[in-house]
């Protein structure tokens, strides 16, 4: 916010986008960074939209992580595999399945439905993953569906 104010005051080139970690499991940015983007007209480019694979549907509570995956090898990412997150994942997966979609579809479509999101930064290791990521946001969530998703994976509180 301060950089935006200074840029306006001094007629500097303004920021046009911001990158923040943002997903259905990581919503802390909605308390500060996202409202600032909306206030200053900045586009948001969320990264880790699939929470390091947890929102793909391939990981399940109580199962070992795939050998070589981030969740198996890096302690930072293992911290995401909590009972609280798996409870959200299971509810979100059921929500998506009931509507004929995947958890991955929901993760991308939910981000695409956010007003300030201009694109999503997503990684892929196979051509199939690229295709799945590219087509996932085709699901246009209704206002009622967005409200239901918010109840299943609530915003972080300040």
Locations of the language-model features?
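Beta/alpha (TIM)-barrel catalytic core signal, keyed to glycine-rich beta->alpha loops juxtaposed to Asp/Glu
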Residues: 1-151, 156
């Amino acid at each position: 916010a301060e950089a935006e104010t200074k840029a306006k005051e001094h007629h500097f080139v303004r920021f046009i986008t911001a990158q923040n970690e943002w997903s259905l499991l990581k919503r802390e940015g909605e308390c500060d960074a996202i409202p600032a983007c909306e206030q200053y007209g900045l586009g948001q480019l969320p990264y880790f939209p699939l929470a390091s694979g947890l929102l793909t549907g391939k990981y399940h509570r109580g199962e070992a992580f795939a050998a070589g995956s981030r969740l198996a090898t890096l302690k930072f990412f293992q911290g995401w595999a909590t009972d609280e997150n798996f409870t959200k994942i299971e509810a979100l997966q059921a929500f998506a399945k009931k509507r004929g979609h995947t958890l991955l579809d929901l993760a991308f479509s939910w981000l695409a439905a956010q007003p300030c999101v201009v694109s999503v930064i997503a990684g892929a290791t196979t051509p199939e993953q690229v295709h799945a990521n590219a087509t996932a946001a085709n699901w246009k969530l209704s206002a009622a569906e967005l409200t239901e998703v918010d109840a299943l994976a609530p915003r972080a509180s300040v």
